[in-house]
């Protein structure tokens, strides 16, 4: 059966280009009715180019159809908003008539648009959940470490510990300058940072520009004789040399219970020193930083110390939890960073990291780390792994038990969880918001397996849990939480439809057929495909109609095709409560709820769309055809319908 497709809507100045392509083209006149649009879009089984007048439709209606807006201009006028285009085509590409360049531009942008979908779900989760499972750097970037508990199973970065493997080289990409990268991966939950050897503050100001939120929530004590004055109220400059813990302690207020981080990046000038003197000085500076941090271990949660590898020693000792390479460092820079887990208060539970202790270092092994991981053309993924490893609490969300509200985004259907489907459904039942991959098209960028859509619907829908596809979830949040998900959000609705999303949300009251639930693009085509491939699948429905009875074709085809994810509790309440009203009452409820639809049959406006027995017959027929293969209980839904 066809998978979700996108409608690639181009403004008129691009319509001549798409005519040179191989995707179908859909011309919109602006005179189409709701049902015309629904029926016509349903005929396409691939992404389709569209152009013409869409000004009478709202953003939610068009997103419901899978529209992505493409133009050389900034905006497109819709019925309710002026929409910022999703894909801005450079004018030189438009003038060139180069179809490959045009489609590459769309494809590259669509990959980036996936982030908009994930960010929107995370924004909702940040409002509703305390615990975050399956987390990566994207969650850390926006989490509040004083409120949120961030769990996951991130990839472990290259680390040096006694008797441990360093790890293998991996592909990487360029990143920020070395010291900016250092602040980027080490600063997360600390509220007070004591940064010794801060230099002229350029690094700190670059970090402020890169991550203003994290910069602002820290009180910075910076120590360096050359540090200039700073106008930022959260930066306190100390123009001193730090020789002992006393130089730091006098600036600490122990009446405040805060998480503190110690950074030591001290390097004196070489001046007239020979090689031996210079190496001895550097070695002593690094050890002094470790000693000061260790002596103040009760005041700091952790420390990050400069660590230069000596040329003249085959082995040496330092105080360390881990040594690791530096993202963005030059390939010939034989300097690591030394992370020390200390005993001070922390918002993040870092008990899985060993306490800092005296460690023997084999010089050839740590030099190998430099050779494997340093270089100006590397650092992005190293930095990400360090950030995740230091600040994400290592826990498997499928096994974790807690009473805290939790979010489970983008990990449940990782291939490592294959065979654990019962646990996945249990998590979706408990979670404030959870996602699972249901797309059947080849997946090139992620290592996920697909859950059957019909099983997800039958297993995932409860009175207080709504199950929708990812596009439906975004449309629902636009409708019910417009302060969290704005109408102008840029995302790829076709990509979103490859996910099932469970939300701890009750059925809307009244239970209106909003776009977020009722889209069923291509349902008529799905029904025809079933008939022309295997007419026995429709025999019971045909016979019932000859007898003057009925079953819900929408429900039956939805389940049989495996092409849709939608909430059954909400759907059944629509049929039994909302659709039982007359036209005036139906329209009143839609208006009062500010709901929108993309399918409307005028001939059914005054009548119920179906009755209880139609739904029961559809479920029974699905059970008769697929019951032996369906992993979810159908009988429980039949029993519920009898009493709903």
Swiss-Prot record:
Protein name listed in UniProt: Core protein VP4
Main location: virion
Function: The VP4 protein is one of the five proteins (with VP1, VP3, VP6 and VP7) which form the inner capsid of the virus.
Keyword Translocase annotated: no
UniProt family annotation: Belongs to the orbivirus VP4 family.
Location in the cell: Virion
Lineage: Viruses, Riboviria, Orthornavirae, Duplornaviricota, Resentoviricetes
Gene Ontology CC annotation, any one: viral outer capsid
Keyword vocabulary terms for this entry: Capsid protein, Outer capsid protein, Virion
Family annotation (InterPro entries): Orbi_VP4, Orbi_VP4_C, SAM-dependent_MTases_sf
